[in-house]
Every structure is written in structure tokens, then in C-alpha cells.
């Protein structure tokens, strides 16, 4: 039987952590790639898709690792491969390839803006500590700093960490060439002339074999019985060499690095602005789904208050650090309760021409929304606007 030569042709396949949707045209191949691990299931792409080609999967179960399935599903035949979802994904979980090359024709033709990612580290303030890389939930910190023995057995010696110079002096008028300094330090050498019967006086010199290995520990100074040794160390810079940078495409602007930086060296603008509220009376106790799936660790279980401080109020099962929240909406999507979380986005930090398509999508994304009833089967979940919730 003859093979079909009709175009376009569509395919969808799983390749490791990626799901690849493909559209083959006569002369061009478009591919939309979803990184399953990076996708938070926030639903921005679901709402933004002009073709309504993206639907929710089992977001809570997928994000908790209970099932090995993507949090969203893309219909490869309905998808127009326009790239709008790529432009609006705060997690860079989606990418578009044209003939194997990662591109965004809709941006190239000024048909849609992109996120204006401004996060940066002031190198003059940065002391090259490890706090930002340790707290970043998105692994967006590129730390290109030499490794030393404190962090790894194979690391460089600690005395090489800072640019410095060490001066070693021996007052030969005081020195008796006893050699104790050379006994305790491998970098010091005693050169004595062989004494003869004509004179029992010792003569010679004390030298340092390798100046670069001296870490100015001053053991030789303290152990010298004649106080003949002086060691002076001059530090040229008290900063570690190397660079610590934020990788813009990976940064989700949660501000963890910014709020924990002891030198206040980090600045950034949130990708998404807005407000989010959790209503304790609607939140089911013992659930913790939103806490487990939050990509920024902004949601947490609050400490229990004494009954005397509750004043008749219901104890909250979950709390949110609004500084760390990026208003992605993943918690709203995954919440199995009704109206427990309300998200009100007010804007997206973008650069580029704000086209009619963009304005239409923004109107939808900035409509206040609340948590859905529950999730059961893929495609069954949906977000509700606040207005719909009140009318129900």
C-alpha cells in the first residue's frame, strides 16, 4: 500500500524528560518541546493558547511524583506552533524548534513580546559565598568559582584562596642556626657550613624553598627561640576569584536569592505581578498539595497558635510568603478544594511590542481566578474566575 504524502503530518513522542510535539510541513518541520520536570503545571500556557490546544493533566499527582506523566497535555494537531506558550512560560519549560533550530518566529516578526528578565548580581558587592546557589529552587545560579579544600577533598589549598604575598625575614645576627624552624616547616631549609677544628662557630643561612606555599601560619615565628624570624602577609584582595551569575532564562524571579543575600548584591523584577490569598475556612486540613507542588517553596505549614490567640478564628492549614510567590498559579490549579486560593494577577513584565493578540491574552490571564473543584482525569480540570465562583 502506498504511503500517504499528505501534509501536514503530526507526531507526539516522549524522549526522556521531554515530550516532543511535531508538525511536518512540505518544506518545514516545527517542534514544540515540553520539559516535563521543569513544567510546574501552572496553567498559564493552557489559558494563553490561541488554539486551545493545551489542557491540564493530573497536576497535583504529576508534580508530587505520584505518576510519571506531564502536568499538561498538548494536542499536536490543534497546536499552531506559534510559540505564545513559550513566550509566557515563567519556567522556560517549553521551547519551539524550526527545522531543529530553537527559534521564536512570532517574536522575530514582532508579533508577541517576551519576558523582560532583569535579574542580576552586582559583582562588586558579591563576596562569592554559596547562599544564592544553595537556596535557589530553580538551579538558576551559575557559580564559576574555584573549589577549595573546605568544600571538597580534591579542592585547592585554602592558602591559595586569596591573592596575597608573604614576606619571610630572618635576622641572622639573632639566628643561631638551630634548625627548629626547618623541623616544623617543610618549606624552610637550613644551610650550615661544616665546622672545623679551627672554629666551632656555626655559620650558614636560613632560606625558604617555596614562597608561594607559605600560608603565613607563623609557627616558625612562634617557635624560634631567638625571635629571629619575621613573617608578613599582604592580602591584595579579600574576595574569592571567579564569578557568580544568574542565568536569566532559568530564573523564575522567586527572590529567594535576593532576600537571603547578605551583601544585598542581587536585583530583579518579578516576571508576574499580582496578589494571592488563601482562605482557611475553605482549605481542607491535612492536604498539603499546594505546599508540595509550589515551585518556589512560598507555601508552608504555619505553626499552630495557642487557642487563647485564635479569638474564634479558624486555624490556617497553609500560609504563603508573598515575597517568594511568583503568581504562577500552580497552587490554584492543583488545589482539590473549592475557592480555597484566589489569584489576582495585575501584569506581566514583558519587553517588545504589545500586539492585539498579547492584549487579548493578558486580559484573560489577569482575570481573578480561584481554585477548581477537584482533579480526576486528564483534561477534566479547569480554572474558575472569581465571578463564576460567586455565581455558583
What is each residue range found by the language model?
Residues 1-30, 38, 62-81, 86-392:
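Flanking helices and flexible, charged tails adjoining ferredoxin-like Fe-S electron-transfer domains
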Residues 39, 43-48, 52-57:
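Short, contiguous, helix-prone interaction/anchoring segments in small proteins
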Amino acid at each position: 500500500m502506498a504511503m500517504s504524502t499528505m501534509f501536514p503530518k503530526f507526531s507526539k513522542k516522549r524522549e526522556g524528560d521531554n515530550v516532543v510535539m511535531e508538525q511536518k510541513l512540505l518544506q518545514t518541520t516545527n517542534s514544540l518541546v515540553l520539559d516535563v520536570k521543569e513544567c510546574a503545571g501552572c496553567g498559564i500556557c493552557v489559558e494563553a493558547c490561541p488554539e486551545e490546544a493545551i489542557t491540564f493533566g493530573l497536576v497535583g499527582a504529576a508534580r508530587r511524583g505520584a505518576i510519571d506523566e506531564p502536568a499538561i497535555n498538548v494536542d499536536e494537531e490543534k497546536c499552531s506552533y506559534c510559540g505564545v506558550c513559550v513566550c509566557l512560560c515563567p519556567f522556560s519549560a517549553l521551547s519551539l524548534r524550526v527545522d531543529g533550530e530553537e527559534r521564536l518566529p512570532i517574536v522575530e516578526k514582532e508579533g508577541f513580546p517576551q519576558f523582560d528578565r532583569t535579574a542580576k548580581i552586582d559583582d562588586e558587592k558579591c563576596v562569592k559565598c554559596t547562599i544564592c546557589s544553595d537556596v535557589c529552587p530553580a538551579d538558576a545560579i551559575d557559580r564559576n568559582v574555584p573549589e577549595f579544600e573546605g568544600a571538597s577533598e580534591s579542592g585547592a589549598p585554602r592558602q591559595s584562596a586569596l591573592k596575597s604575598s608573604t614576606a619571610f625575614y630572618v635576622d641572622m645576627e639573632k639566628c643561631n642556626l638551630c634548625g627548629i624552624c626547618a623541623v616544623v616547616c617543610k618549606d624552610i631549609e637550613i644551610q650550615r657550613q661544616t665546622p672545623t677544628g679551627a672554629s666551632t662557630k656555626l655559620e650558614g643561612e636560613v632560606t625558604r624553598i617555596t614562597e608561594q606555599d607559605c600560608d603565613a601560619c607563623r609557627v616558625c615565628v612562634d617557635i624560634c627561640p631567638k625571635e629571629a624570624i619575621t613573617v608578613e602577609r599582604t592580602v591584595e584582595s579579600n574576595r574569592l576569584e571567579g564569578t557568580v551569575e544568574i542565568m536569566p532564562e532559568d530564573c523564575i524571579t522567586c527572590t529567594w536569592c535576593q532576600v537571603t543575600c547578605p551583601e544585598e548584591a542581587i536585583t530583579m523584577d518579578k516576571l508576574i505581578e499580582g496578589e494571592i490569598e488563601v482562605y482557611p475556612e475553605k482549605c481542607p486540613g491535612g492536604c498539603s498539595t499546594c505546599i508540595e507542588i509550589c515551585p518556589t517553596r512560598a507555601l508552608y505549614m504555619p505553626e499552630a497558635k495557642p487557642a487563647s490567640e485564635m479569638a474564634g478564628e479558624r486555624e490556617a492549614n497553609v500560609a504563603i510568603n508573598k515575597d517568594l510567590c511568583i503568581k504562577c498559579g500552580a497552587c490554584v490549579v492543583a488545589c482539590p478544594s473549592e475557592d480555597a486560593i484566589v489569584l489576582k494577577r495585575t501584569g506581566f513584565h514583558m519587553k517588545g511590542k504589545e500586539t492585539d493578540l498579547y492584549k487579548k491574552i493578558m486580559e484573560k490571564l489577569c482575570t481573578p481566578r480561584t481554585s477548581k473543584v477537584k482533579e480526576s482525569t486528564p483534561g477534566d480540570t479547569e480554572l474558575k474566575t472569581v465571578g463564576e465562583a460567586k455565581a455558583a
